[in-house]
UniProtKB/Swiss-Prot annotation:
Name recorded for this polypeptide: Glucosamine-6-phosphate deaminase
Gene: nagB
Superkingdom, taxonomy of origin: Bacteria
Family designation: Belongs to the glucosamine/galactosamine-6-phosphate isomerase family. NagB subfamily.
Pathway per the UniProt entry: Amino-sugar metabolism; N-acetylneuraminate degradation; D-fructose 6-phosphate from N-acetylneuraminate: step 5/5
C-alpha cells in the first residue's frame, strides 16, 4: 500500500488522473468508479482532458435501492452529471436500483464484473471504514449484494437529501471480494473526519469490523490523502 499525501482535493484529483493515464497506457480497458465527494476532482480532470474514453467500459460500485435513474440523488444521475455527460464511454454499468428482484440484480452484476475485469478501481472510504456500501461486519468473501445501510452511513449521506428520512435504507453494492479482484485500486480520502478510518485501514488489524483494512492484502493499492485525512498516520 502506497500513501501519497497532497495539499488538497484538487491536487489529489490531478494525481489520481496521472495514475489513470499510466494505467491506460498499459492497456486498461475497464474502470471501476465511485460516487460521493472524494472522486469529484478526479472526474473533473477526466472531463477537461483531451483523452478519448469511448473505448472504455465503466462499472460503478453501487446504487441505492428504490431510486430511479432520473432521481437527482441516484448514483446514475451523479455519474452522468460529473463524468458521463462530458466524457462518453463505450458502456457504463451501474446496478439497477429499481429491479423487481434485487438479489437477481446482484447476481447479474457479478456476471458483468466477470465479463469485464476491472483494471483501475477508484474508491472512497466511509467514516466507519466502509468501501462501496460494504458496511462493518460485511464478509470479506461477499460479492455483489443487497446492503442494509447503517445509521452512520445514512446520516453521512443525508447532506445530499432534503431530509434524513429521504435517504434510502438499502443499496446494491459490489462486494469486497469483487473489489479485491481489481488489478489496481486508487483510494481517495480528504478531511479530518476520514482520519480514524485511514489509520485503521493502514495500520489496524485486518478485520471485517473495518472493511477497508482488507486492502492491506491487495498487491497494488495507492491511497491519496490530504494532511487532515493523514493526520493520524504519523
Amino acid at each position: 500500500m502506497k500513501i501519497i499525501r497532497v495539499q488538497d482535493q484538487i491536487e489529489g484529483g490531478k494525481i489520481a488522473f496521472t495514475l489513470l493515464k499510466d494505467s491506460l497506457a498499459k492497456g486498461a480497458k475497464t474502470l471501476g468508479l465511485a460516487t460521493g465527494s472524494s472522486p469529484i476532482s478526479f472526474y473533473q480532470e477526466m472531463v477537461k482532458s483531451p483523452l478519448d474514453f469511448s473505448d472504455l467500459t465503466s462499472i460503478n460500485l453501487d446504487e441505492y435501492v428504490g431510486l430511479s435513474v432520473e432521481s437527482d440523488q441516484s448514483y446514475d444521475y451523479f455519474m452522468r452529471q460529473n463524468l458521463f455527460n462530458g466524457k462518453p464511454f463505450k458502456k457504463n454499468y451501474l446496478p439497477n436500483g429499481l429491479a423487481t428482484d434485487v438479489e437477481a440484480e446482484a447476481k447479474r452484476y457479478d456476471q458483468i464484473i466477470a465479463e469485464h475485469p476491472i483494471d483501475f478501481q477508484v474508491l472512497g472510504i466511509g467514516r466507519n471504514g466502509h468501501i462501496g456500501f460494504n458496511e462493518p461486519g460485511t464478509s470479506f468473501e461477499e460479492e455483489t449484494h443487497v446492503v442494509d445501510l447503517q445509521e452512520s452511513t445514512i446520516e453521512a449521506n443525508s447532506r445530499f437529501f432534503t431530509s434524513i428520512e429521504d435517504v434510502p435504507k438499502q443499496a446494491i453494492s459490489m462486494g469486497i471480494a469483487s473489489i479485491m479482484k481489481s488489478k489496481m485500486i486508487v483510494l481517495l480520502a480528504f478531511g479530518q473526519e476520514k482520519a480514524d478510518a485511514i489509520k485503521g485501514m493502514v495500520f489496524g488489524p485486518i478485520t471485517e469490523d473495518l472493511p477497508a483494512s482488507i486492502l492491506q492484502k491487495h498487491d497494488h493499492v495507492i491511497v491519496i490523502v490530504d494532511e487532515a485525512a493523514a493526520s493520524q498516520l504519523d
